[in-house]
Amino acid sequence: MAEGEGWRPPRPCEAYRAEWELCRSAGHFLRHYYVHGERPACGQWRRDLASCREWEERRSAEAQADSLPPGPEGEPRVAGAGPNAVTGILTRNQGTERPHGDTR
């Protein structure tokens, strides 16, 4: 198999565009600023969208590499590494929060 031939972006490009537009919306900005005290960083959604579109147009190896999360320092980027291998975002129940309905 040629390099990159069997690889596809984990989501359709339309999903990245929708996430980027949501991230840039006024409502999201206000909620994020209220909770975190800083502007939301939407650049990764924009880069993911650009990589996805480049992949659809050219099947570019650079687009594939750009969509992979960074590996530990000095190690290559690995598909499936990161907060959530499908969406690339942390879910609400990751970290110290208890799952919904847990009354402990």
UniProtKB/Swiss-Prot annotation:
Keyword Nucleotidyltransferase: no
UniProt subcellular location: Synapse; Synaptic cleft
Assigned keywords, A-Z: Secreted, Synapse
Post-translational modification: Rapidly degraded by proteolysis following neuronal stimulation, resulting in increased AMPA receptor clustering.
Predominant cellular place of this UniProt entry's protein: other
Protein origin, superkingdom: Eukaryota
Residue stretches of biased makeup (Basic and acidic residues): 95-104
InterPro entries on file: Pants/Emi1-like
Record flagged with keyword Cytoplasm: no
GO biological process: negative regulation of long-term synaptic potentiation; regulation of synaptic plasticity
Region (Disordered): 58-104
Cellular component per GO, a single term: synapse
SUBUNIT field: Interacts with RTN4 isoform A/Nogo-A; the interaction results in enhanced RTN4-mediated inhibition of AMPA receptor clustering. Also interacts with NCAM1, RANBP2 and CCT8.
Role this protein plays: Negatively regulates long-term potentiation and modulates adult synaptic plasticity. Stabilizes the interaction of RTN4 isoform A/Nogo-A with its receptors, inhibiting clustering of postsynaptic AMPA receptors at synaptic sites. Upon neuronal stimulation, degraded at synapses, reducing RTN4 signaling and allowing AMPA receptor clustering at individual synapses.
Family membership: Belongs to the UPF0545 family.
Name of this protein: Synaptic plasticity regulator PANTS
